[in-house]
Swiss-Prot record:
Region spans: Disordered: 47-77, 91-285
Keywords annotated in UniProt: Glycoprotein, Signal
Comp. bias intervals (Polar residues): 57-67, 105-114, 134-145, 174-185, 221-285
Protein name: MARCO-like protein
Record keyword Glycoprotein present: yes
Domain of life: Eukaryota
Residues carrying a glycan: 24
GO CC annotation terms, alphabetical: endoplasmic reticulum lumen
Signal peptide segment: 1-20
InterPro entries: Collagen_Structural_Proteins
Length: 285
C-alpha cells in the first residue's frame, strides 16, 4: 500500500515537473516573438523613409511605391505612357501620339504638320471638317463652291481651287493651288483618278464634263463650262467664274446641263441650291 502511494506521488511529481517545463518554454517563446516584430517594423519604416528621401531628391513628378511599381516622369512637349522605370515612350514635337485605339470613332480629330496631314489648313485656304451626318464647310477667298453629303469626310481646299463633294463612305479631299482634287465613291476609300475609273479633268477653254454612276471625281480649270454627273457619282469641282452646283435627291452634285440642274456662270459667289437628300454648296472667289 505504501509502495502504491509512493508510486502515485512519484508520477504526480514527474507530471508537475513536465508541465512547468512546457509553461516555461511557452513563456520563453512569447517573450522572444515581439523582438522580430519590432525589427520588421523598423525595416518597414526604414524603407518608407528611404523611399520618401528618394522621391524628395528628384525634381520631376514621381509616384513612389514598393519595388515593382511604376514611376512616371513628365517632360514638356512629350506624351509619356505608363511603363516600368527607365522605360519611356516619348513622342516627337508636332507629332500626334495616340495611346491605343482612337476612342472618338467616326470623328476626324487629327493633328499634325502641314506637310504630313491632309486635314491641316494653310493660310488662304479653306478647310472643311466632316463628321458622321454633319457637313461643316468653310470657304476662304479664292475658292469657289464646296459641298458634302451626310456621312462624308473632311475637305481641304487651297487658294484658287473650287468646290469639293464627297459621298457616304468616301475619304478626304485635298486641293492644291490652282487645281482641284476630288475623290471618293460609295463604300470605297479615297479615289483619285486611277485607271478603270471615270476621272475627268478639263483644261482651259474646254467644254463640259459629265460623270456616270460609280465614277470618281471631275475637275475643271478656269474658263471651263458646266459640269454634270448622274446619281451615284462623286463630286464636281470648278474654279472661280464657273457656274453653280445643284444636287438631286439621293445623289451627289449635278451641274451644267439643262433638265438636270441650274447653271450660273458669273464671277463672284456662285448660287447655293439644295434639294432633299443633296448636300449644301457654298462658293466664294
Amino acid at each position: 500500500m505504501r509502495a502504491f502511494i509512493f508510486f502515485l506521488f512519484m508520477l504526480l511529481a514527474m507530471f508537475s515537473a513536465s508541465s512547468t517545463q512546457i509553461s516555461n518554454t511557452s513563456v520563453f517563446k512569447l517573450e522572444e516573438n515581439p523582438k522580430p516584430a519590432l525589427i520588421l517594423e523598423e525595416k518597414n519604416e526604414a524603407n518608407h523613409l528611404g523611399g520618401q528621401r528618394d522621391s524628395n531628391k528628384q525634381g520631376g513628378s514621381y509616384t513612389q511605391g514598393n519595388p515593382g511599381t511604376f514611376r512616371l516622369q513628365g517632360q514638356p512637349g512629350y506624351f509619356n505612357k505608363l511603363e516600368k522605370p527607365r522605360h519611356f515612350k516619348q513622342g516627337r514635337a508636332g507629332v500626334l501620339n495616340q495611346p491605343g485605339i482612337l476612342k472618338n470613332s467616326g470623328k476626324s480629330n487629327q493633328k499634325g504638320n502641314p506637310e504630313s496631314s491632309n486635314k491641316q489648313e494653310n493660310s488662304g485656304s479653306s478647310s472643311q471638317l466632316g463628321r458622321p451626318g454633319i457637313s461643316t464647310q468653310q470657304g476662304n477667298p479664292g475658292s469657289s463652291d464646296q459641298q458634302e453629303k451626310p456621312g462624308s469626310f473632311s475637305q481641304k481646299v487651297m487658294v484658287g481651287s473650287s468646290s469639293q463633294q464627297g459621298k457616304p463612305g468616301s475619304s478626304s479631299q485635298h486641293g492644291n493651288l490652282g487645281s482641284s482634287t476630288q475623290k471618293g465613291n460609295l463604300g470605297s476609300s479615297s479615289l483619285q483618278g486611277h485607271l478603270g475609273l471615270s476621272s475627268h479633268q478639263g483644261k482651259p477653254e474646254s467644254s463640259g464634263q459629265q460623270g456616270k454612276p460609280g465614277s470618281s471625281s471631275q475637275q475643271g480649270n478656269l474658263g471651263t463650262s458646266g459640269q454634270q454627273e448622274k446619281p451615284g457619282s462623286s463630286s464636281q469641282q470648278g474654279k472661280p467664274g464657273l457656274s453653280s452646283h445643284q444636287g438631286k435627291p439621293g445623289s451627289s452634285s449635278q451641274q451644267g446641263n439643262l433638265h438636270l440642274s441650274s447653271q450660273q456662270g458669273n464671277q463672284g459667289p456662285s448660287s447655293k441650291q439644295r434639294k432633299p437628300g443633296s448636300s449644301s454648296r457654298q462658293g466664294n472667289l
